[in-house]
Amino acid sequence: MSIAQTKRFTLDEYHRLGELGFFHEDDHIELINGEIIEMASKGTVHETCLRNLWKQLPKIVGDRATLQSQAPITLPPKSEPEPDFAIVQNRDDNYLSSHPKPTDVLLVMEVSDSSLAYDQDVKIPLYAQAGITDYWIFNLFDNYLEAYSKPYQDNQGRYGYSNKRIFLSDEIITFPCFPDLSLDLAKVFPPKRNF
């Protein structure tokens, strides 16, 4: 009996597929651990949270860093996620020559409803292994922010974050990369709805 194996792509192969037209601009995909993953569609609560973040984040971050949304971050050797938001260091070429790498990333943010388990079970070890120091999940099921920091590797080789803090939707959180800046979560989380 033969066993089917999944084809895992390198970053170069993934980029080449894009150059050859295998993907369309409206495809919502990302490369995670060598696999091409179709991202979940976004519901109205998810989109509302994204819009609220778009209203708040540019005003707060200003010119101190670069804010990107649903744009690639290159995590060699086989991942290129497109988080809902990332705050990355400013660069003279504004990332024209390459996507941000882990050393450029100050904070990654995901808005999670139907993707919550994936953002916790897959993205946490992915970002921790890459050395992303801070990762926030706007958890729309429980209506709170999960703030992860201090990436580590355990004795079995698994990656994660040693620090997890919960911030309720009416709290204010400071940015780890800019401790003098804060985000009022009441302006971000939509009113609680049952899913």
Question: Which sequence ranges carry the predicted segments?
Answer:
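Gly/Pro/Ser/Thr-rich low-complexity, intrinsically disordered segments predominantly at protein N-termini
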Residues: M1-F195
